[in-house]
Amino acid sequence: MDPLAALLDGPRAHGAFLLRSVLTPPWSLRIEDGAPLTLMATVRGEAWVVPDDGEAVLMREGDIAIARGPDPYLVADDPATPPQVLILPGQECRTPDGGHLTELADVGVRTWGHGVDGPSILLTGTYGMAGEVSKKLLAALPALIVLRAAEWTSPLVPLLAEEIVKDVPGQEAVLDRLLDLLLIASLRTWFDRPGSDAPAWYRAHHDPVVGQALKLLQHQPAEPWTVAKLAANAGVSRAAFARRFTETVGEPPMTYLAAWRLALAADLLRQHPDSTIGAVAHQVGYGSSFALSAAFKREFGLSPQQYRAS
C-alpha cells in the first residue's frame, strides 16, 4: 500500500466541508476555523494565501495550496486587501466586527460568493475534525504548501469542480473520496519532488526490510504482532530489525502499530455504525472493547461511542 494512501486509509474525510467560491476583487477572507487541514485549488484567476507567521504566496490558475491548521491565515486577491469575511469554526461566516454578511451569499449548490460568475473561482475542501487526518501526516507538513500547475498533471481538480455543484443522492460520499484522492495525489507529488525533504515514514516504504514490515502491519493489523515475529518475516535478527525500523520510521514498531490500529478503529466506527465496539476492537487487534476504549480515548480525547456520534 502506498504510504500516503495507507495513512489516509484510516481516518479520512467524513462529511467534509467543500465549497466553490466565486469572487470579484477586492476580496479578502480571514480563515480562523481551526481546521487541521484545508486544500484549496484555483480554478480561475489568482489568489494570495497569507499565513500570520509566514510569507504571502501567490496561487495562479491550476495551482493547489494545502494549509495545515490550526493557525489562522488570509486568502485574498491582494495581501493588502483588508479582511471582509471572517470564517470561524463550523464554517460560520461573519464580518470582521462580528456582524452578518451582506455582500456574499449562496449562489448555487455548494457555491458562494459575489455572483454566479466572476474573475476568481476557488475550490476549498476542509478536513474539519481531529482524527480525519493522521497526526503523523500533519506533523510532516509545513504550515503551507503550494503545488504549481506546471509540476503535475491530474484530472482530479477539473473532476472536483464538476462534481462539487451536483445535488444528487450519494454526492457527499463522492466528494469526500475525491478530496482524499486529491490530497494524496498532491502530497505524493510534493514529497517526490527532486530535493524534497520527505518524512522518514514516507521513505521507509522503499526500504526492503522495513517496507515489508509496514505492509504486514497495515494489511493485517489484527495479527498478534511482536518485534520478533516481524523480524522473522523480514529475515533479520530482532535487534537489527528494531533498530532499523526505529531509525527509518522514526518510532519503534509497536508504537507505530498501536497508532495504526487506532486509526483503523476510528474509520471503522464511522463506516460501520451497527458494529459493536467489541467487534471493531477484534478487527484491529485489541482483545476487548475496554482495551480499545481506553487507548482510543487517550489518542483522540473521545470514547469510541462519542467519536462515532460526532
Which residues are covered by each model-predicted region?
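Amphipathic alpha-helical segments enriched in hydrophobic/aromatic residues interleaved with Lys/Arg
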Residues: 99-181, 185-186, 190, 194, ...
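Short hydrophobic-aromatic micro-motifs
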Residues: 65-68, 122-124
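Basic/polar phosphate-binding segments, predominantly the helix-turn-helix DNA-binding elements
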Residues: 181, 185-191, 212-219, 223-263, ...
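Generic protein-terminus/edge-of-domain signal
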Residues: 1-65, 71-114
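A short, Lys/Arg-enriched amphipathic alpha-helix from helix-turn-helix/homeodomain DNA-binding modules
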Residues: 149-165, 175-179, 183, 187, ...
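Short hydrophobic/aromatic patches on the structural cores and recognition surfaces of FHA
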Residues: 39, 45, 62, 125, ...
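Short, charged helix-to-loop "capping" segments that act as catalytic/coupling loops
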Residues: 51-55, 267-280, 285-288
